[in-house]
UniProtKB/Swiss-Prot annotation:
Protein family per UniProt: Belongs to the PCNA family.
Native organism: Archaeoglobus fulgidus (strain ATCC 49558 / DSM 4304 / JCM 9628 / NBRC 100126 / VC-16)
Subunit and partners: Homotrimer. The subunits circularize to form a toroid; DNA passes through its center. Replication factor C (RFC) is required to load the toroid on the DNA.
PROSITE patterns for the chain: PCNA_1
Annotated NCBIfam families: PRK01115.1-5
Keywords for this protein: DNA replication, DNA-binding
Job description of the protein: Sliding clamp subunit that acts as a moving platform for DNA processing. Responsible for tethering the catalytic subunit of DNA polymerase and other proteins to DNA during high-speed replication.
CDD domains: PCNA
GO MF entry, a single one: DNA binding
A single GO BP: leading strand elongation
Pfam families: PCNA_C, PCNA_N
Protein name: DNA polymerase sliding clamp
Length: 245
């Protein structure tokens, strides 16, 4: 049996993070907490979600268990939940997930985990540049770039970290120096990425959330968000766009 209680804010954050890429997911209730990971149908991006046991108000599991969840359905339900609500998730059998908050109880049919696409292996990436910044600033930069182009260049060197977008007639550069960043190692890297994916990723975060970017040259980027006051970690890995000569 699974019986856990979490804040509405935590549930909304997790569901938003996962539905950015997939509509169904395997959710693992482990001794150390909740874990999920999935790759989008185009094999361009991966999401990895971890919520430590201590981030829950209550975390009771008889044994480690994996369930298959219709994340779109849970996301729809989460729209009715306030960030301050306490939400209880109960799994008593293989077929049903109960979602309880206030005087409301939803019963959601579970999916056979084996019917959900196999979970991806997390790639081992040696990426030279590490940038730590406020997620809200990153979100503003991506929103601005979206008005110019459908792709952006992330660039890191000793001068700082830049996000660049160029359209037919307009261009934009977002630049933060080492002193403006929370942490920066000055590593040299440059890659191009899809704005559409980045916009979806940004929806989980806001001002005050922490974002760590691990960047290489023509390599996937790792975007690690520390959310809900550090109680949840959401990581996205996004493949680069190959630039034409």
């Amino acid at each position: 049996m699974i019986d856990v209680i979490m804040t509405g804010e935590l549930l909304k954050t997790v569901t938003r993070a996962i539905v950015a890429l997939v509509s169904e997911a395997r959710i693992h209730f482990l001794e150390k907490g909740l874990h999920s990971r999935a790759v989008d149908p185009a094999n361009v991006a991966m999401v990895i979600v971890d919520i430590p046991k201590d981030s829950f108000e209550v975390y009771n599991i008889d044994e480690e268990k994996t369930i298959g969840v219709d994340m779109d359905r849970i996301f729809d339900i989460s729209k009715s939940i306030s960030t301050k609500d306490l939400v209880e998730l109960i799994v008593e059998d293989e077929s049903t997930l109960k979602v309880k908050f206030g005087s409301v109880e939803y019963k959601v049919a579970l999916i056979d985990p084996s019917a959900i696409r196999k979970e991806p292996r997390i790639p081992e990436l040696e990426l030279p540049a590490k940038i730590v910044m406020d997620a809200g600033e990153f979100k503003k930069a991506i929103a601005a770039a979206d008005k110019i182009s459908d792709q952006v260049i992330f660039r890191s060197d000793k001068e700082g970290f830049r996000i660049e977008a160029k359209g037919d007639v307009d261009s934009i550069v977002f630049h933060m120096t080492e002193t403006e960043l929370i942490e920066f190692n000055g590593g040299e890297a440059r890659s191009m990425f899809s704005v559409d994916y980045l916009k979806e990723f940004c929806k989980v975060a806001g001002s005050g959330d922490l974002l760590t970017i691990h960047l290489g040259t023509n390599y996937p980027v790792r975007l690690v968000f520390e959310l809900v006051g550090g109680r949840a970690k959401v990581e996205y890995i996004l493949a680069p766009r190959i630039e034409s000569e």
